[in-house]
Amino acid sequence: EKIKKWTGFENTISFKEFHKFYMGDLHFGNCAGCDILKGENIDVIGTPHQPEWIYKLFAYSLGYDVDDRLKPNTQVEHNGFRFYFMTYTDKLLRAIQFYIIESELEQAVGRARLLRCDCVVNLFSDFPLRQATLKEAKYDTE
């Protein structure tokens, strides 16, 4: 609610279970191909992590048998950014995890059609996207 008040944006994409806090029908996992937010300013809130077994099943289906566990506060470098993230030491599992998370975030951010429309998408996540411009915000101090 603080984010919504701070940004003033009507449209939000976040987790399905937070739907009661914002308007609209889109959420992580169900926004691919939707054009209803074209040209609209959007807040994308959250990082769409998947259960650990999904990353491992993905690796296993590619023929890899990986035995690694998620490690909190791991310093990583991705998309030109260095940040701390709960991820794997194993490079393959990390690549799979990042691909799945990044794909879902790109789908959410892409609903505004930023390349064709003059609008703004605020991404509130601990996973920066390649085209992100990092800004320090004081929304949580008010």
Cite the ranges covered by each PLM segment.
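ASCE RecA-like P-loop NTPase motor cores
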Residues: 1-142
